[in-house]
Amino acid sequence: MTQAAEHITVLLHEAVEGLAIKPDGIYVDGTFGRGGHSRLILQHLGPNGRLIAIDRDPQAIAEAAKIQDPRFEIVHGPFSGIVSYLDERGLLGKVDGFLLDLGVSSPQLDDAERGFSFMKDGPLDMRMDPTSGQSAAQWLARADVDDIAWVLKTFGEERFAKKIARAIVHDRVTEPYVRTRQLAEMIARVNPSKEKGKHAATRSFQAIRIYINSELDEIETALNGALQALAPEGRLSVISFHSLEDRLVKHFIRKHEKGPEVPRGIPLTEAQLAGGRKLKSVGKALKPSEHEVTENSRSRSSVLRVAQRLAE
């Protein structure tokens, strides 16, 4: 394993403050990573508080094992499994706060062997959990032009998706794409777009990573699971890093603030209408401060949204 840079947790204090932690509350950190949020949550908890952390990355699980605290528990798996994890523990509907820090972490990006970054050469893997599922190289070796182009367009909003997809399928006949630099250099050659401050392969690498890890489906499942997990007045605190993630989170909160669509003409009282609302936004969406962006450039695109569970 190559040496990874120390992970700087983005919007650390803001995300944890959004949980409005009760000393004896029950909390879930759905993305343990390197433990920045979890460690701060534990500092706010009293002796009877409880924190369950989740991560599907074996390296994160190894880091979590260093926390020797009876209030803390780590679960190895995707955060989309929140309902089953809590059901096993008899905690559905009893959680006071659920935190998600989406996307890929700095240690994952900086470790060339994980295959997430086009800046360092490594095997073209991109799996959050390298022990499960197909790697990016395996998928690119089998997918057809239309499938590859759809992924690049849908998850990367890549304007030249078809051109890149055709090049991948053409080239793999003689030399399959198995290294990150190999793929990044090809994309830079065939992609005429020159976005300021952005490598030509940025959108494609993001798209492939999202697809390989089913990231948007995972997020949607986890958000729906949060509705079952949270107690009345429980908080949902979510940090996203690109427009696709943030759009999903924003629309989810708005949908459950409004409640179900009711056809015109059906006589319902204000109380009955309010009964269908499951969430309310807490404050406005937050971006990192200029100081944080200066200290950690990867925080630039992050957005924090907080919502509170309403009683039904």
Swiss-Prot record:
Subcellular location: Cytoplasm
InterPro entries: RsmH, SAM-dep_MeTrfase_MraW_recog, SAM-dependent_MTases_sf
Regions of compositional bias (Basic and acidic residues) in chain numbering: 287-298
UniProtKB keywords: Cytoplasm, Methyltransferase, rRNA processing, S-adenosyl-L-methionine, Transferase
A Pfam family it matches: Methyltransf_5
GO cellular component terms attached to this protein's record: cytoplasm
Main subcellular location of this protein, as a coarse class: cytoplasm
Enzyme Commission identifier(s): 2.1.1.199
Annotated region described as Disordered, given as residue ranges: 285-306
Domain of life: Bacteria
Binding-site list for S-adenosyl-L-methionine: 35-37, 55, 101, 108
Gene3D superfamilies according to UniProt: Putative methyltransferase TM0872, insert domain, Vaccinia Virus protein VP39
GO biological process: rRNA base methylation
Catalytic activity: cytidine(1402) in 16S rRNA + S-adenosyl-L-methionine = N(4)-methylcytidine(1402) in 16S rRNA + S-adenosyl-L-homocysteine + H(+)
Keyword rRNA processing: yes
Listed GO MF terms: rRNA (cytosine-N4-)-methyltransferase activity
Transmembrane segments: none
Alphabetized HAMAP family for the sequence: 16SrRNA_methyltr_H
Homology family: Belongs to the methyltransferase superfamily. RsmH family.
Function: Specifically methylates the N4 position of cytidine in position 1402 (C1402) of 16S rRNA.
Protein name according to UniProt: Ribosomal RNA small subunit methyltransferase H
Source species of the chain: Aeromonas salmonicida (strain A449)
Gene responsible for this protein: rsmH
